[in-house]
Structure formats: structure tokens, C-alpha cells
């Protein structure tokens, strides 16, 4: 568990020689759909005061902390659309124990929502006041800055005022009456493990620069080069194999329930999947399809 749950792309984890993803895929999985909402909403009981609060991820800031226990707090800390959303969340989110994080989907009254890049279509018109896609649960002893995160692996019940969207997924087993929990691994896993014996891995600082280079290549639409990997050709090759492995695993995943997803009017399986077990939490996303769409979306922002 980590203080703030940042879900990594598998290929990014390998840059420093981290083997947790390779360990993870050899065991049983807890699988869910990755929901493309915005902004991120954090809510629950503030351990410092015992009062209910709402906020964005800024509630975890070390210095300029923005925890909102009243509407006046929201007016002081936020403005514009984010403030409006937080006012709705303060009014309609249930007062339950614990601390949660999820993505805001929208307000009730429709059966179709485009909170960020992907459009979600529900079976019926949503009658609840707000819609949230929860994904993370936090525990904290006395201060939100000390909160410890873990993936949300239990169900939050809808209320008459708030609809919670958590779309489960499974691994295709080949049997119509059996939901798989383990991946079928291809020979590329052995290729990766063999290549790792000869690769010179990079530091955390160097890995951060490589990730920036990768994001730039996606945003600007050019192919990755050796220079993007700081001249480390074998690491670039390993990175490519990890993408092949990720795509193979993603192809084995299936949506179990939840709203239909559309991108630019075309039906898609969703943004991707989130897999979790004792070795960590990872996202299986086609970055060339969805990250570039997010980069080019004027609504896209980290709040």
C-alpha cells in the first residue's frame, strides 16, 4: 500500500528493474474497468476533526491543503466548475465512515455522459443527483497527509441521491459459464525475463525523464527513438516487449457490467482495465489510443 495510489502503466515500471508486474501476472487478479471521469473527488471523515469533507486530490497536499467541510470552505478554496461539482458532492455524497476517492461522472437527469474523453451510456436515465466512479479507499490515523491508499475491492451501495459506478471485469477463460481469474501467459514473458538479465536499468530520476519523453511522443505523434531512452537501446527493446505483453493481457480481459463506452461516436470496450493483487495495482490501457485523446481534449486537466 502507498500513501497516494498512483496506478502505473506496466511498461513504465520496468524502467528501474521493478519486477512487481511480472510477479503480479502469475497470480489471481482482481479486475475492474478503468472509468474515465473528471475531476477526481476525495470524500469521507476528516480524521483531524471527525467531520465529513469533500475535495480534490489537493486534500493530500503537504502545504496548501484544501479540505472542505462546509460550502464556505469550497468557496474559499475553489472556483468555477470544480467548485460547483464540490458543492453538489458536499450535498449528496453519503456520510459513511472511511475516506474514498473516485472520478466524477456527472449529475442526474440523463443516460449519457462525457465527463472527460469517453462517453458513457447507461441503460436508463440516472435519477440520482450525482454519479461517482469510486476506485480507492484510504485509512488515516489523525491527518489526511498520512493517509494510506488501497484499491477499492468492496461495494459501495447507491443512495437515493448518489449513484456509484464500479464496472467489474474478468479474464476470458474460454468457457461460457466460467469467469477467469488468471492470465494465460505467452512466451513474451520468458523473453522479457531473459532480456532483464542483460539490461542496464535507470535511476528513478532518469525513469521520470523517460516517462516524459514517452508522453511527448504520444502527444506529438512520433515513434519512440533510442534518444528517448537516454541512449539505452536494450532498455527501449525491453520497454517494447512490455507493451506487447500488456496488449496480450488486455486482449484477455472482458467487461462484466457497467455502462457502454464510446470514443468519437464508436463503441469501444472502455479506456482499459485495472488489475490488482498482493504485488501491486496496474492499468492496462492502450496509451496510443486514449492518452493522445486525453492530451488533445481541451477539458483534460489534473485538478
Where are the regions a protein language model picked out?
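Covalent nucleotidyltransferase
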Residues: 35, 40, 51-204
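Short, surface-exposed beta-edge/turn micro-motifs
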Residues: 28, 38-40, 129, 269-273
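Short, ordered beta-strand-loop transition motifs
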Residues: 47-48, 125-126, 266-269
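A two-mode feature
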Residues: 135-303
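Active-site-proximal "nucleotidyltransferase
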Residues: 1-39, 47, 51-112, 212-259, ...
Amino acid at each position: 500500500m502507498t500513501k497516494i495510489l498512483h496506478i502505473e502503466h506496466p511498461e513504465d515500471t520496468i524502467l528501474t528493474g521493478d519486477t512487481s508486474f511480472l510477479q503480479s501476472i502469475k497470480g489471481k487478479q482482481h479486475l475492474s474497468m478503468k472509468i474515465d471521469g473528471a475531476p477526481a473527488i476525495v470524500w469521507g471523515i476528516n480524521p483531524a476533526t471527525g467531520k465529513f469533507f469533500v475535495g480534490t486530490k489537493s486534500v493530500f497536499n503537504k502545504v496548501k491543503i484544501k479540505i472542505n467541510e462546509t460550502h464556505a470552505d469550497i468557496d474559499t478554496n475553489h472556483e468555477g466548475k470544480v467548485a460547483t461539482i464540490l458543492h453538489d458532492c458536499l450535498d449528496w455524497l453519503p456520510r459513511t465512515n472511511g475516506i474514498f476517492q473516485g472520478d466524477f461522472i456527472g449529475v442526474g437527469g440523463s443516460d449519457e455522459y462525457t465527463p472527460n474523453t469517453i462517453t458513457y451510456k447507461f441503460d436508463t436515465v440516472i435519477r440520482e443527483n450525482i454519479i461517482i466512479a469510486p476506485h480507492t479507499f484510504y485509512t488515516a490515523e489523525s491527518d489526511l497527509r498520512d493517509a494510506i491508499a488501497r484499491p477499492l475491492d468492496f461495494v459501495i451501495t447507491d443512495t437515493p441521491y448518489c449513484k456509484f459506478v464500479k464496472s467489474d471485469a474478468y479474464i476470458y477463460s474460454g468457457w461460457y459459464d466460467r469467469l477467469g481469474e488468471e492470465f494465460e501467459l505467452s512466451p513474451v514473458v520468458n523473453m522479457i525475463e531473459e532480456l532483464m538479465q542483460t539490461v542496464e536499468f535507470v535511476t528513478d530520476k532518469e525513469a521520470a525523464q523517460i516517462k516524459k519523453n514517452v508522453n511527448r511522443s504520444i502527444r506529438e505523434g512520433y515513434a519512440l527513438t533510442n534518444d528517448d531512452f537516454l541512449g539505452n537501446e536494450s532498455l527501449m527493446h525491453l520497454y517494447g516487449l512490455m507493451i506487447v505483453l500488456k496488449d496480450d493481457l488486455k486482449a484477455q480481459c472482458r467487461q462484466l457490467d457497467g455502462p457502454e463506452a464510446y470514443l468519437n461516436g464508436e463503441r469501444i470496450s472502455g479506456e482499459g482495465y485495472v488489475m490488482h493483487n498482493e504485488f501491486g495495482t496496474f492499468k492496462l490501457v492502450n496509451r496510443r489510443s486514449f492518452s493522445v485523446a486525453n492530451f488533445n481534449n481541451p477539458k483534460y486537466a489534473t485538478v
